[in-house]
C-alpha cells in the first residue's frame, strides 16, 4: 500500500501530505476492493458464520466471524499494523501495542481528529446491506474461509472510507478560510456541500464499473468476442459502481465531515 507522504526537501520538512499520492492510493484501493468482492463472491452468504453466536471459554459470546476478526486484529496489532494512521481496527478495545519497532510516519493528521472511526457502522452496513447484494444465498458450511474473505473485504472498505481523514486534512490546508466558518458553527450540512464534487464522484463510479468488468470477466476461449450480452461477470459491474455511489463515497464524506468538525479543537 502506497503511503500518503512524499519528500519535500525544499520546505525543510522531511515529509508532507500529498493530494496526488492520496488520489493514487484511492485509485489503487479500487483494485483491492473489486478483487476482494470477487473473492468473497466465490462463497454463498453463509450467514451462520456472522449471525450465530456461541459461548467462548472466556464466557463471552461471539460469532465465528467476529472471533476471527478480533483474533486477527490482535496479531496484526502486535506486528504494528495499527501504528499506521490509515489503518483502523474494528475492535479498538482489543488492540495491544506493537511488539516490534515500526517506522514512524510524520503526524500529518490533526491529533484531536485522528480518532474518528466508523468501523462499527461499516460492519453493520457490510453484513446487513452490502453482502446480500453480491453473493448468492445459501450455506456451504465453509465458514473459516468465508470469515477470512469477509475480513479482507471489511479491511479494504474501511481503509478506503477512513482515507477521508487525509482527504479532509488536505482540503482544509488548501482553503482553511472556506471551512473554518462551518467548522466553528459545527454545521455538518455546510461541510458536506463543500466536500461534494459530483463530477468527480461520477468519474470514480465509472472507473470502478470498468475495473469490475475487466477484472471479473469469465474468460472463455470458444465464445464470440465482442458479444456483450454473453459476457458473464463474477461481480456485477453495475453493482460495484452502485456500492461506491451509495455507500463508499457517502461514508468517506461522513468521515471527512467528522474529521473537520474536530479540526479546530
From Swiss-Prot:
GO terms for biological process: amino acid biosynthetic process; aromatic amino acid family biosynthetic process; chorismate metabolic process; prephenate(2-) biosynthetic process. The keyword Amino-acid biosynthesis applies. Expressed in roots, stems, cauline leaves and flowers, and at lower levels in rosette leaves and siliques. Keywords: Amino-acid biosynthesis, Aromatic amino acid biosynthesis, Cytoplasm, Isomerase. It comes from the Eukaryota. Residues 10-265 form the Chorismate mutase domain. Coiled coil: none annotated. It is found in: Cytoplasm, Cytosol. One of its GO terms (cellular component) is cytosol. Pathway: Metabolic intermediate biosynthesis; prephenate biosynthesis; prephenate from chorismate: step 1/1. Homodimer. This is Chorismate mutase 2. It comes from Arabidopsis thaliana (Mouse-ear cress).
Amino acid at each position: 500500500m502506497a503511503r500518503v507522504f512524499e519528500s519535500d526537501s525544499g520546505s525543510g520538512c522531511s515529509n508532507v501530505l500529498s493530494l496526488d499520492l492520496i488520489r493514487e492510493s484511492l485509485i489503487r484501493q479500487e483494485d483491492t476492493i473489486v478483487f476482494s468482492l470477487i473473492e468473497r463472491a466465490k462463497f454463498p452468504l453463509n450467514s451462520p458464520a456472522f449471525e450465530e453466536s456461541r459461548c467462548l471459554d472466556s464466557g463471552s459470546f461471539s460469532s465465528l466471524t467476529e472471533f476471527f476478526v478480533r483474533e486477527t486484529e490482535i496479531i496484526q496489532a502486535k506486528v504494528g499494523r495499527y501504528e499506521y494512521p490509515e489503518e483502523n481496527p474494528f475492535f479498538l478495545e482489543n488492540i495491544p501495542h506493537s511488539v516490534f519497532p515500526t517506522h514512524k510516519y510524520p503526524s500529518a493528521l490533526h491529533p484531536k481528529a485522528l480518532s474518528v472511526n466508523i468501523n462499527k457502522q461499516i460492519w453493520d452496513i457490510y453484513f446487513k446491506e452490502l453482502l446480500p447484494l453480491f453473493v448468492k444465498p445459501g450455506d456451504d458450511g465453509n465458514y473459516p474461509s468465508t470469515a477470512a474473505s469477509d475480513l479482507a473485504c471489511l479491511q479494504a472498505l474501511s481503509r478506503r472510507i477512513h482515507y477521508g481523514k487525509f482527504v479532509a486534512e488536505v482540503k482544509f490546508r488548501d482553503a482553511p478560510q472556506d471551512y473554518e466558518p462551518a467548522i466553528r458553527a459545527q454545521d455538518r450540512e455546510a461541510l458536506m456541500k463543500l466536500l461534494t464534487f459530483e463530477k468527480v464522484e461520477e468519474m470514480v463510479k465509472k472507473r470502478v464499473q470498468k475495473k469490475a468488468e475487466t477484472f471479473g470477466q469469465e474468460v472463455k476461449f470458444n465464445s464470440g468476442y465482442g458479444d456483450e450480452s454473453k459476457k458473464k461477470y463474477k461481480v456485477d459491474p453495475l453493482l460495484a459502481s452502485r456500492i461506491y455511489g451509495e455507500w463508499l463515497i457517502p461514508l468517506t464524506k461522513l468521515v471527512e465531515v467528522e474529521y473537520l468538525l474536530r479540526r479546530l479543537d
